[in-house]
């Protein structure tokens, strides 16, 4: 009955967002609110409290945790419009510290992955958004789409000493390409942390080539 009433008073887009939010709050990734990354979260929780600006590729449970447990300003990009709207609604009390951007990379399949290259020219909007803001993150979580490109882009634009935490890194060898530029700093379960070195230690021309090469690699 409630759903029928909602459909009568809200436009289709708002109704869709509300329905998505209901499912969002039931999602297993929002259960156990103090546990992140299936428990591999001690490194993240230790380092996030040291920074005043946090960047995130892909939004959700970690976004909410940071807003509720730190004073950091949060800059986030995601490929799902419904997911972005749900996160906004779910974090209304902290929206003054949340800058969240929906990057339209086309129709999506599972986990926000584009199902085609129809909007290939928009892929850079996703990888670059965080670094187009006035303030740069001091900690970046790579946990969404285009992960290698996001990492390399962060390496290019981040200040020396910035921490980059790469989720699902340890057991996915295809991500290990990034060690061409920087060595592992710390590990925590499935995650690996890197620290951005001085730009003088990076071949920036080669880095730009690799960013272009990985721009269209969605995973």
Annotate each PLM feature.
Residues 38-44, 61-63, 124-130, 150-153, ...:
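A generic local structural motif
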Residues 36, 57-58, 145-148:
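Short, glycine/acidic-rich beta->alpha junctions
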Residues 1-35, 209-219:
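Membrane-proximal basic amphipathic "stem/tether" segments
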Residues 101-153:
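Internal catalytic-core helix/loop-beta-alpha segment
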Residues 38-110:
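SAM cofactor-binding core of SAM-dependent methyltransferases
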């Amino acid at each position: 009955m409630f759903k029928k009433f909602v459909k009568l008073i809200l436009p289709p887009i708002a109704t869709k967002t509300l329905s998505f939010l209901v499912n969002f709050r039931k999602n297993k990734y929002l259960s156990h609110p103090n546990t992140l990354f299936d428990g591999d979260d001690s490194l993240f929780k230790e380092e996030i409290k040291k920074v005043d600006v946090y960047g995130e590729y892909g939004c959700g449970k970690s976004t909410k945790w940071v807003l509720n447990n730190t004073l950091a300003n949060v800059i986030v990009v995601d490929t799902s419009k419904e997911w972005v709207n749900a996160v906004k609604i779910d974090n209304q009390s902290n929206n003054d510290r949340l800058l969240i951007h929906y990057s339209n990379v086309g129709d999506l399949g599972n986990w926000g992955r584009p199902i085609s290259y129809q909007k290939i020219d928009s892929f850079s909007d996703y990888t670059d958004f965080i670094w187009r803001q006035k303030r740069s993150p001091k900690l970046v979580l790579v946990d969404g789409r285009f992960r290698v490109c996001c990492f390399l882009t962060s390496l290019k634009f981040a200040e020396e000493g910035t921490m980059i935490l790469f989720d699902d890194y340890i057991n996915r060898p295809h991500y290990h390409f990034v060690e061409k530029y920087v060595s592992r700093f710390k590990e925590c379960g499935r995650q690996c942390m890197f620290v951005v070195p001085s730009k003088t230690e990076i071949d920036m021309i080669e880095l730009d080539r690799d960013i272009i090469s990985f721009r269209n690699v969605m995973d």
